[in-house]
UniProtKB/Swiss-Prot annotation:
Species in which this protein is naturally found: Arabidopsis thaliana (Mouse-ear cress)
Swiss-Prot/TrEMBL GO biological process terms: epigenetic regulation of gene expression; gene silencing by siRNA-directed DNA methylation
Every SET domain range: 495-638
Gene: SUVH2
Protein name from the UniProt record: Histone-lysine N-methyltransferase family member SUVH2
Residues annotated to bind Zn(2+) 2: C436, C448, C474, C478
GO terms for MF: DNA binding; histone methyltransferase activity; zinc ion binding
């Protein structure tokens, strides 16, 4: 810009006292039309002309005069002291007031579909409307929070199962030339919305969303909408808009920080967030921002002391996408100002400070886990017993960590990556030398697909489509190549795991990687013995694991009965009652240290690939949900209710 403009320093807050001296009591607060902060902004905004002619200069001056007037109106002296010293508008203004914690507020019941997560009999109109009122979830007891956490998990499981199902169908139709691939993440969300399966969709939640915990990870923005965590698919600021607010004021409730604005500054607990607007399709600032829509909503939230939820988008390479979204908790907006950004245009900035007393930020945990994977001894100088418990028998090393005591018990066992089947255990005809005759990869009508009921068990990313009694994979006598999508569990461990010592569970297992829902983790390995052999060995004190006692959590994965009322769980191929055991007294693997839980994040799926004997399937473990780095793995061993959270190496 070639000329100096006659307006104040934009880095300074306008003087509210002087700016309001000439106003009258009848003046109204100026609010503009809602404009959301897109990431990136969808609509092209023409950059200002670089010429220095008089008309262009006059227009620019007029624009900043308009912004200054907007500032003045935003700080009009129409405030009175409210409860706890909070400044609010006059009683006749109709403004939304932040209610103190001890005061009565609207206590909402869970919306339809939240209590028992069943399909509503009334299909929601595709013309979906955002909520028209703010609400804060009532403070609940431990059991209520625990129950609603499970409801949230089931909803996420339904979303993931539906998304994977739709993606597989879309890929299949695309290969057959029956249509182009569609966004399965969006399609799954819209289907669930039309079935009334979105949570909190009838209220605009302020503060924490019940069931969502700090550190929860999401792969898609649409999932945030399904849970009511952030209601915008592209916009960075989610707020109750002025058009929908009874008071005509927007109130911001959550933001997504994904690095789309060059003026953002993020140090974790303190965040300087750039307002919306003024960007082109290359994410470059090309125009000045205005105090409207989400920007005004952020200012109003600061004014009323309303906290906002912060979700961070983090680059993380995985089989689904190159970015994940992490819920990092609640922040308070403590300051805002208008400044000239790096590109030379005026932008609004908001300083947010994280509220104390919350768990560690999920984004910080992910960064710590990344450093731990690459330089473990630098992050933890002491405590490591072994950097590879498997002695290179797994595809990736298995760490052994103990900073509690001097116990090194896991090193005393022979590590095996796969279960050992003693010779002759199958009897005559147990080993089948037949397989499919596909080339490179299997087709839908191959022998192995027919064994699975006419469909493949996995999608192209190796995720389990739906749980079954047993899954048949391509085996040694199949002619398809190693890249066949029907070869998943036989490839072994892919995620880095750590066996760690715990005061609560004895030994436990946590992941150093982000494990996606439906992904294969590892095999549960031991020496397979018959029932008679197990009885004899047990009398000698050998430790036994009984695969037939694991709960059938696989029934929940891929269960779309909430979405499609006529959905029927697959009953073919079937599996007879299992009557074998695994002796883990001398030979075992990392899975044997996974703790027991009635609310597991890992499920058992029986698989056959190197033989066809239904009485002796392999015990494979899959993720029931997205498992964050450093989260502990847990299984439901089928133990009594009073046994929970303790080392359950014998069931």
């Amino acid at each position: 810009m070639s000329t100096l403009l006659p307006f104040p320093d934009l880095n300074l807050m306008p003087d509210s006292q002087s700016s309001t001296a000439g106003t009258t009591a009848g003046d109204t607060v100026v609010t503009g039309k809602l404009e959301v902060k897109s990431e990136p902004i969808e609509e092209w905004q023409t950059p200002p002309s670089s010429t220095s002619d008089q008309s262009a200069n006059t227009d620019l001056i007029a624009e900043f005069i308009r912004i200054s007037e907007l500032f003045r109106s935003a700080f009009k002296p129409l405030q009175v002291k409210g409860l706890d010293g909070v400044s609010v508008y006059g009683l006749d203004s109709g403004a939304i007031v932040a209610v103190p914690e001890k005061e009565n507020r609207e206590l909402i019941e869970p919306p339809p579909g939240f209590k028992d997560n069943r399909v509503s009999t009334v299909v929601v109109s595709p013309k979906f409307e955002r909520p028209r009122e703010l609400a804060r979830i009532a403070i609940l007891g431990h059991e209520q929070r625990k129950e609603l956490r499970q409801v949230m998990k089931r909803t996420r499981m339904t979303y993931e199962s539906l998304r994977i199902h739709l993606m597989a169908e879309s890929m299949k139709n695309h290969v057959l030339g029956q249509g182009r691939r569609r966004r399965s993440d969006m399609a799954a969300a819209y289907i669930m919305r039309d079935r009334g399966l979105w949570l909190n969709y009838d209220k605009h939640i302020v503060g924490p969303v019940t069931g969502v915990e700090v550190g929860d990870i999401f792969f898609y923005r649409m999932e945030l909408c399904v849970l009511g965590l952030h209601g915008q698919t592209q916009a960075g600021i989610d707020c109750l808009t002025a058009e929908r607010s009874a008071t005509g004021e927007p109130i911001a409730t959550s933001i997504v920080v994904s690095g789309g604005y060059e003026d953002d500054e993020d140090t974790g607990d303190v965040l300087v967030y750039t307002g919306h607007g003024g960007q082109d399709h290359q994410h470059k600032q090309c125009d000045n921002q205005r105090l409207v829509g989400g920007n005004l909503g952020m200012e109003r939230s600061m004014h009323y002391g309303i906290e906002v939820r912060v979700i961070r988008g983090i680059k993380y390479e995985n089989s689904i996408s190159s970015k994940v979204y992490v819920y990092d908790g609640l922040y308070k907006i403590v300051d805002w100002w208008f400044a000239v950004g790096k590109s030379g245009f005026g932008v609004f900035k908001f300083r947010l400070v994280r509220i104390e007393g919350q768990p560690m930020m999920g984004s910080a945990v992910m960064r710590f886990a990344q450093t731990l994977r690459n330089k473990p001894s630098m992050v933890r100088p002491t405590g490591y017993v072994s950097f590879d418990l498997s002695n290179k028998k797994e595809n990736v090393p298995v760490f052994l960590y103990n900073d509690v005591d001097g116990d090194q018990e896991p090193r005393h066992y022979e590590y095996i990556a796969k279960a050992v089947f003693p010779p002759g255990i199958f009897g005559q005809g147990g080993i089948s030398r037949t397989g499919c005759e596909c080339k490179l990869s299997c087709t839908d009508d191959c022998l192995c697909a027919r064994k699975n009921g006419g469909e493949f068990a996995y999608d192209d990313n190796g995720h389990l489509l739906k749980g079954k009694h047993v899954v048949f994979e391509c085996g040694e006598f199949c002619t398809c190549g190693p890249s066949c999508k029907s070869r998943v569990t036989q490839k072994g461990l892919r995620n880095r795991l750590e066996v760690f010592r715990s005061k609560e569970t004895g030994w436990g297992v946590r992941t150093l990687d982000l494990i996606e829902a439906g992904a294969f983790i590892c095999e549960y390995a031991g020496v397979v013995v018959t029932r008679l052999q197990a009885e004899i060995l047990s009398m000698n004190g050998d430790v036994m694991v009984y695969p037939g006692r694991f709960t059938d959590q696989w029934r929940n994965w891929g269960d779309l009965s909430q979405v499609y009322p006529d959905f029927v769980r697959p009953n073919y191929p079937s599996l007879p009652p299992l009557d074998f055991s695994m002796d883990v007294s001398r030979m075992r693997n990392v899975a044997c240290y996974i703790s027991h839980s009635k609310e597991p994040n890992v499920m058992v799926q029986f698989v056959l690939h190197d033989h066809n004997h239904l009485m002796f399937p392999r015990v494979m473990l899959f993720a029931l949900e997205n498992i964050s780095p450093l989260a502990e793995l847990s299984l439901d061993y089928g133990l009594a209710d009073e046994v929970n959270g303790k080392l359950a190496i014998c069931n």
